[in-house]
C-alpha cells in the first residue's frame, strides 16, 4: 500500500542545510496501522508530509497504491491526494460553520456534486459518532469532538490511507482513548491504512500493528509492535518502551540479592502458563520474583519477569535451559555475586 525508498528531505536556508529526513525506507501493508515514534525534531512530521508530498522529498521515492507520487504531474498528484486523508494536532475548523457545514465544505472543495453532499455528510457524522452535533459550532465542541469532525473531513473522499499528525497530543487521556478507539474501528470496518506519528509509546501500544522509531531524521528501528516491545534493540526504543512498561530495577536494589538475577520473557499464550514455578520445583531451585507483569499488546500477552534464582549452579543452569526450551527468552543479568560485563 505504502512504500518509501531511500527518502531524504533537506531544508536549505542562506546560512545552513538541515536534513529533516535521512535516507528512510519502510513499507506499510494494506489495512495496517503503522506508528512512527520520536521526540520533537526527530523528523516525524517531515516524513509524514512526504507521504502525500505536502513536503516534496529531496531524493527517494514514495509509492502509494502502486503510484510513485514523486513522478506525478500537478493534476495527477491532486487526484492521488484525494485518496490520502490527513488529520492534525490542531483541528483547523471553520468557526463560522456548523459541524455539518465544515464537513460539507470539504466535500464541495473536492468537487463532489451538490446533490450528493447532504447524504455523504450524514453518513460521515454517523461514522464518527457526531450525528447529534450536526448543528453545533466549533466553539460548542470539546477537543475530542473537534478531532472527530477533522476525521470526518479527512474521510470525505473515501480515502484508502489516513495520515495522522500527532492527532491525540492535544487531548486528555480519556479523550485520547476514545479517538484511538475510533481510528481502530475505521481501520477494521473500512480497511483503512493508517500512518500515525506520535511521541507517546502508549498510543502505538494501543492500536498499531507495526512501528518505527525515528531519531535525527533516521529510522533507527522498525518492526512488528509486539516484537519491538518484547526485544527493543536501540537505546532510544528501550527508553520509549520504559515509559510504558518499566521493568528496570535500580542497581542498589539488586545488590541486596546474592543469587543469580535473570530476566525471563514469555511471548503469546506461554506467558499465561505456570512454567516458572513448575521448572523451579522440578530442578530444586528457589525463585524470588523481584518485578514483573503480563502486558497485552495487540491482544497478545507478553510476560516479562525479573527474578532471583538460588540453588546449585548446575541446577540453575539446567532450569534456565529448560525455560528456554519452553519458548521463553532468558537474559542472565547477574550470575551469583559476579556481575556480567
UniProtKB/Swiss-Prot annotation:
Class of enzymatic activity (EC top level): translocase
Keyword terms of this UniProt record: Amino-acid transport, ATP-binding, Cell membrane, Membrane, Nucleotide-binding, Translocase, Transport
Main location as per UniProt: membrane
Disulfide bonds: none
Catalytic function, reaction form: L-methionine(out) + ATP + H2O = L-methionine(in) + ADP + phosphate + H(+); D-methionine(out) + ATP + H2O = D-methionine(in) + ADP + phosphate + H(+)
Location within or outside the cell: Cell membrane
Domain of life: Bacteria
Record InterPro entries: AAA+_ATPase (IPR003593), ABC_transporter-like_ATP-bd (IPR003439), ABC_transporter-like_CS (IPR017871), ACT-like_dom_sf (IPR045865), MetN_ABC (IPR041701), MetN_ABC_transporter-like (IPR050086), NIL_domain (IPR018449), P-loop_NTPase (IPR027417)
Function: Part of the ABC transporter complex MetNIQ involved in methionine import. Responsible for energy coupling to the transport system.
The protein, known as: Methionine import ATP-binding protein MetN 2
Naturally occurring in which organism (per UniProt): Shouchella clausii (strain KSM-K16)
Gene that encodes it: metN2
